[in-house]
């Protein structure tokens, strides 16, 4: 843990001007956790600190792969054009030939199949009603040297751990609470300072990320390792309110950030990736739109990841899990119905069932007046 006094950080008043006891309790628990893991996981922390790497813009390997893919596509189009031209020439020569080709040969020539494009290998996509930590523990490996998984931390662009040490909640804070992630991020204050000074970009932020390698996650005496990709989604809520950024620009920024994260996973060579409702809720993006962006990119065939786990815990105050499940149920195909249409139909069916049940109850009620 950095030599910084955090004791008074968590005493920020709430909106009513009073301290927040629950947040203060979480802040104290966070301080205890950070101090404990700094001793018990000292070697792991040292190893992860030594391996931290920064990404500023798309990884070079991904850019090269996209250029090679575009070149191959152009070459394939040229080949098809040349074959088509050759076929036309051959057809013209056949027409002026003295003897027509036998019927069987002509049939075989006409039915010759065109060259097919190779089918891209797409990942297996699953949506879990679980936290990212639980998904890592259920699907990760227990040895750092065999780590084959990466997890996306829904990061704060300017604050290590997303306010975890101040007692704030969130996906990144939960990851910190079950690992030594904060101990590593707290040492990267130069990177966060650079983000604050130069890269806010109308609250859209930029394609900048940290990767903390092979972080150990623990819960209930079970542990697993995963690389943590620390990247921030655009803050749509602030971008709309403070800079009048339009919806199309917001979605374009998020799409580019999603490609950035998937490209980093490719660069790391990890076969498994834990994602989630990134950019939703406090950041202001609709979960259905976010899920659709993820679906399009994962179905594009541009990425090498083999298994993608969407960890989206269901809650009482949002429909993120239901929306992600709806959009990705037919992966890689697009779901033709919107979530609103499906939800409206389900609500109408429930209302009809309730009305029918109420009518049956009325019919069964015996009129007491006939016994007078």
What are these regions (language model features)?
Residues 1-372:
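Macrodomain-like recognition of ADP-ribose-binding/processing modules
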């Amino acid at each position: 843990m950095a030599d910084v006094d955090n004791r008074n950080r968590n005493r920020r008043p709430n909106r009513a001007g009073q301290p927040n006891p629950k947040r203060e309790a979480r802040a104290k628990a966070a301080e205890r956790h950070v101090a404990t893991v700094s001793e018990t996981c000292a070697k792991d922390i040292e190893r992860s600190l030594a391996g931290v790497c920064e990404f500023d813009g798309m990884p070079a390997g991904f850019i090269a792969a996209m250029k090679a893919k575009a070149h191959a596509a152009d070459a394939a189009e040229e080949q098809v054009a040349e074959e088509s031209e050759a076929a036309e020439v051959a057809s013209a020569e056949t027409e002026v030939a003295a003897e027509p080709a036998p019927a069987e040969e002509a049939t075989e020539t006409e039915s010759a199949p065109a060259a097919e494009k190779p089918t891209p290998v797409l990942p297996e996509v699953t949506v879990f009603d679980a936290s990212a930590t639980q998904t890592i523990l259920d699907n990760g490996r227990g040895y750092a040297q065999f780590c084959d998984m990466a997890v996306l931390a829904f990061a704060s662009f300017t604050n290590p751990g997303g306010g975890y040490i101040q007692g704030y909640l969130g996906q990144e804070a939960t990851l910190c609470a079950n690992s030594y992630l904060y101990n590593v991020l707290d040492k990267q204050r130069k990177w966060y300072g650079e983000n604050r000074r130069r890269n806010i970009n109308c609250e859209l932020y930029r394609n900048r990320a940290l990767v903390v390698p092979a972080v150990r996650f623990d819960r209930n005496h079970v542990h697993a390792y995963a690389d943590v990709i620390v990247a921030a989604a655009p803050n749509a809520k602030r971008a709309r309110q403070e800079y009048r950024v339009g919806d199309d620009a917001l979605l374009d920024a998020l799409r580019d950030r999603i490609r950035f994260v998937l490209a980093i996973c490719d660069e790391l060579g990890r076969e498994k990736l834990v994602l989630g409702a990134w950019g939703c809720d406090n950041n202001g993006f609709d979960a259905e739109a976010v899920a659709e962006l993820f679906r399009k990119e994962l179905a594009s065939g541009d990425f090498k990841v083999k298994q993608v786990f969407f960890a989206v815990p269901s809650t009482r105050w949002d429909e993120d899990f239901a929306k992600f499940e709806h959009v990705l149920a037919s992966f890689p195909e697009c779901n033709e119905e919107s979530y609103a249409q499906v939800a409206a139909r389900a609500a109408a069916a429930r209302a009809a069932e309730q009305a029918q049940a109420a009518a049956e109850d009325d019919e069964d009620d015996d009129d007491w007046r006939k016994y007078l």
